Regions:
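Conserved PLP-anchoring active-site segment centered on the Schiff-base-forming lysine
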Residues: 101-119
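Active-site C-terminal subdomain of aminotransferase-like
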Residues: 178-181, 188, 193-296
Length: 365
C-alpha cells in the first residue's frame, strides 16, 4: 500500500475521477479500500512490468511499432499458444478495434448482442443493424436468428455489470445452427477466466467454434490496448481496410503485454494467485447473499443490485463516507475484488454494507 496523497473528492458524495490503481490507499490520514478498478490480479503497478517498459523504452525509444518488428512477432507467437489465434492485430483502445472489425461487414449484416454486453460494443454498433438478446431467453434468440440472413453473433465471457459467466456454450450452439459468424468478446474475461487466464473460450472449450476473438490487455493483465485475432485472411482484409492504424503504437506497450502473458503463464505462481482471488470473491459473494442483498455474481466482479438508481446512488455515497470506493451504474454497485484484498479488508467492507443497508432499510434484521 502506498501513501497516496491525491485530490480525490472534488465534490462531496461523488466517486472521484482519479483514484490510484491500488487496492487500498491513504487519504487524509484515512485508509480507503478501492474496489473501482478491474485490476483484480494487481498487475497495474507490477515492478516486473514497470522494468520491462523502462528497458524497452531505453532500447527502442517510443517510436511506433512496425508490423514487422520483432516484438510483434513474439507477441503473435505467444498469443497463438495462449489463445490459438492464427493472426493478430493490436489496437490502442476498444473503440478503434471495434471500428476496424466493423470494416469487414456490409450494411445488411445484423449484429446480435446481449443487453448486458460491453458498453464499447453498444456505442460502436448503435448505427448498425442490431438485435438485442437476453441470455435468459434463448428460445427468443433462436426465433430472432431465423429472421435474418447475414448475421454476426457476439458472445460474452463475463457480464461486467452482473458479474456472472455467460452461458457461452448454449449461445454458440444456437449461432452455429443458424450459420452465424461468431465473435468471442473476451474484453471482460481475458486474463481472468480459463486456464492461466486464457479466457472463456478456453473455459468452455470453444476454440473450434469461434471465428473472431477480441479482448483487452489493459483490464486484468496490467498492459495496454486490445487485440483482434482471427484467421490470417480475415486479418489481412481488416489491415487492408484500415491502412496503418495499428502501426502507431509504441513498442514498449507490446513488450508490457508480452510480459503480462509471461506472468500468468507461470503455472505454480499464477495458480496460487488465482486460487486466492476466487476464494476472496466467493467469500464476499456468500456473505452479501447471507445479508439478504441481491447478487447473481460468480466472479471477482461482484455486482449488487438495488431497487432503483436513487437507492444505489445513496448507498454508493455512504460507502465513500465509510472509506470504500465502488463503481455505480443505475441500480447496481460493482466491487472489483483484488488478490491483494485481505480477509480483514473484505470483513470491513461487509460490515459497512450491513451498517448502511440497515440504516437505509434495505437489509431487514
Amino acid at each position: 500500500m502506498k501513501p497516496f496523497q491525491v485530490h480525490l473528492f472534488g465534490e462531496e458524495g461523488k466517486i472521484p475521477e482519479s483514484v490510484p490503481p491500488e487496492p487500498s490507499f491513504i487519504y487524509g490520514n484515512k485508509r480507503y479500500l478501492n474496489f473501482l478498478h478491474f485490476d483484480c490480479l494487481h498487475l497495474k503497478n507490477s515492478e516486473y512490468l514497470k522494468e520491462t517498459a523502462r528497458m524497452n523504452i531505453e532500447a527502442e525509444g517510443i517510436v511506433p511499432t512496425d508490423a514487422r518488428a520483432g516484438i510483434m512477432g513474439s507477441l503473435q507467437d505467444e498469443m497463438s499458444e495462449v489463445k490459438h489465434i492464427e493472426s493478430l492485430l493490436f489496437f490502442p483502445d476498444e473503440v478503434s478495434m471495434m471500428f476496424a472489425l466493423m470494416s469487414i461487414f456490409g450494411p445488411k449484416t445484423t449484429f446480435f448482442i446481449d443487453y448486458e454486453t460491453s458498453t464499447s460494443l453498444i456505442n460502436v454498433l448503435q448505427y448498425r443493424r442490431i438485435e438485442y438478446y437476453d441470455f435468459h431467453d434463448l428460445d427468443r434468440l433462436r426465433k430472432l436468428l431465423s429472421d435474418h440472413a447475414e448475421k454476426v453473433m457476439f458472445v460474452d465471457g463475463i457480464y461486467e455489470w452482473l458479474g456472472n459467466i455467460a452461458p457461452a456454450n448454449n449461445i454458440v450452439k444456437l449461432a452455429r445452427e443458424s450459420e452465424c459468424i461468431i465473435i468471442a468478446n473476451e474484453l471482460n474475461s481475458f486474463g481472468l477466466l480459463g486456464r492461466e487466464g486464457r479466457g472463456f473460450v478456453d473455459l468452455c472449450n470453444l476454440y473450434e467454434d469461434i471465428n473472431i476473438d477480441i479482448g483487452s490487455f489493459s483490464k486484468f493483465l496490467g498492459g495496454f490496448g486490445c487485440y483482434l485475432g482471427a484467421k490470417k485472411y480475415l486479418i489481412n482484409k481488416i489491415r487492408e481496410n484500415i491502412g496503418y492504424i495499428t502501426d502507431f503504437v509504441p513498442q514498449f506497450m507490446l513488450s508490457v503485454n508480452l510480459a503480462g502473458l509471461e506472468i500468468i503463464k507461470e503455472k505454480t505462481k499464477s495458480k496460487n494467485v488465482y486460487n486466492k482471488l476466487w476464494k476472496n470473491s466467493r467469500y464476499l459473494i456468500t456473505n452479501l447473499k447471507q445479508m439478504g442483498l441481491e447478487t447473481v455474481s460468480e466472479t471477482p466482479l461482484v455486482v449488487v443490485s438495488f431497487s432503483n438508481n436513487e437507492e444505489a446512488g445513496e448507498f454508493t455515497r455512504r460507502l465513500i463516507d465509510e472509506q470504500i470506493i465502488a463503481a455505480q451504474k443505475k441500480e447496481r454497485i460493482r466491487l472489483c475484488v483484488s488478490v491483494e484484498h485481505s480477509k480483514e479488508d473484505l470483513d470491513f467492507c461487509l460490515n459497512k454494507f450491513e451498517v448502511i443497508g440497515n440504516a437505509l432499510g434495505i437489509i431487514k434484521t
